[in-house]
A protein has these predicted regions:
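Conserved NTP-donor binding/palm subdomain of two-metal-ion nucleotidyltransferases/polymerases, i.e.
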Residues: 1-273
């Protein structure tokens, strides 16, 4: 069950992302500081600060200390705006699937840039992020903003055909569920979502707020000159990634396996001679 900090975190995130009024629950000064820290960790402090401005008439928002408000306004970590990096697909590690992806992108790139193509890129990039690290909130927010474009902007029939070609349906279902659970979407607003994966989405969300887990950034290996064996830089991170990859092998088996071995190989390149 989500804590009051987590509930307010996503309420303010939605308020900042869509300029929508939300009802905020009371927080102690310590819990407001914790929410502030979480916004920094996940790169969404600017969006949540905007949400605070949108909800400034809410009684409990008015109880945020002036000191924290001043600190927040001065230490905003600006959420990265969509640019060439975020509008290009990260690519898939499975060679067969990646060739299919690049063929779709190349075909669409020869035409006028379309929101449908950009949404596919967002789905792929969010998928890669989830396979490697878990939920990436800035990427998920970009996807949410695309979904909130005026009706008819996105060709969901074409998008669905691409999702099927890339075997992305289970991951598309998961991303749709995250948009429904965390960002206030109705299922009807996410036409490519065929199944609600609430259990998996809940587990991912819990990991989002568990800052003690390792990540692939820490999953490197070192080797001393007088040793035969290599050691992991962070064994907790390694075991987390093994378990994380195993969980998603059922949702995207053709990509999860190759992604795991690519991450493993990348970690070995960090061996210190």
């Amino acid at each position: 069950m989500a804590t009051v900090i987590e509930r307010n975190f996503f309420r303010l995130l939605r308020a900042g992302l869509f300029s929508s009024r939300e009802t905020i629950e009371p927080l102690s000064p310590w819990k407001w500081r914790r929410l502030y820290q979480l916004s920094l960790v996940h790169g969404v402090s600017e969006t949540i600060w905007h949400g605070i401005q949108v909800c400034q008439d809410d009684y409990f928002v008015g109880l945020i200390s002036p000191e924290l408000k001043e600190k927040w306004s001065k230490t905003i970590v600006k959420t990265k705006e969509p640019d060439e990096d975020t509008e290009e697909a990260m690519g898939l590690t499975n060679p067969l699937l990646d060739r299919k992806l690049q063929a779709i992108i190349d075909q669409e790139s020869s035409l006028e840039e379309t929101p449908t193509r950009l949404l596919l890129v967002a789905i792929v990039n969010n998928t890669r992020a989830i396979l490697n690290e878990g939920i990436n909130l800035p990427l998920l927010m970009e996807m949410a903003q695309m979904l909130r474009q005026p009706a008819g902007t996105i060709d969901f029939e074409k998008l669905q055909s691409w999702i099927s070609r890339l075997r992305l349906q289970p991951m598309a279902d998961l991303l749709g569920t995250l948009n429904v659970m965390l960002l206030g979407f109705r299922e009807a607003e996410v036409p490519f979502m065929k199944k609600n994966l609430e259990k998996t989405a809940t587990q991912l969300t819990e990991e989002l707020f568990n800052l003690n887990d390792g990540s692939t950034d820490e999953w490197y290996f070192t080797q001393k000159d007088d040793e035969i064996f290599v050691r992991t830089h962070n064994s907790r991170a390694m075991f987390w990634h093994v378990g994380h990859s195993a969980r998603f092998s059922r949702l995207y088996p053709s990509e999860a396996l190759t992604n795991f071995f690519k991450s493993f190989a990348n970690s070995l390149t960090h061996i210190e001679e």
